[in-house]
């Protein structure tokens, strides 16, 4: 994608903006764990538990579940060396791999690590859990963990042209999906139709318009609940 493309986003600049904010707040390494942080900096969707280690300078490194690492690397602008997969077994789990990565960025073993801690009404927000926080704190004894999610929140508030254009195109595609469903349900078409069929009609119409992925907000439950998933 070139700079002249209407959907172009300068992701390396976003990383540098985060690094400039890190420097201003005396943060040596930033550990992103929220879905919004990963999407905003990677240009890839990470449905599995994932993390992004951002050094004070240079490229960040993403860590995701090994079965999805190749796909994330393919979707993201980062090269394969900066998208790694973890396995939930000793020495290869996310705590071990990420701690090793952070230690390499802090040669003297000391520094300030920005983390994302908080609460949300959104289940897969991605804030560090208490277990993760405690494990990172134990694995990095010379490192001070500080809450820093406001860095990304502040920077992401201002939308660039590529982001605005992506929102507009996504909205247009959704309108097509709604129209297809409305037409299918009109004049008694809803009779005998299940919620999953309705969801499929919307997905099919949107895919034909260029959609590459659809994910219902609660993971599928709102189009697969109760008796409506079968013929009524």
Labelled PLM ranges:
Residues 171-183, 194-203:
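Active-site pocket-lining segments that scaffold enzyme catalytic pockets across diverse folds
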Residues 186:
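Contiguous, non-catalytic segments that form substrate-binding/exosite surfaces or channel walls
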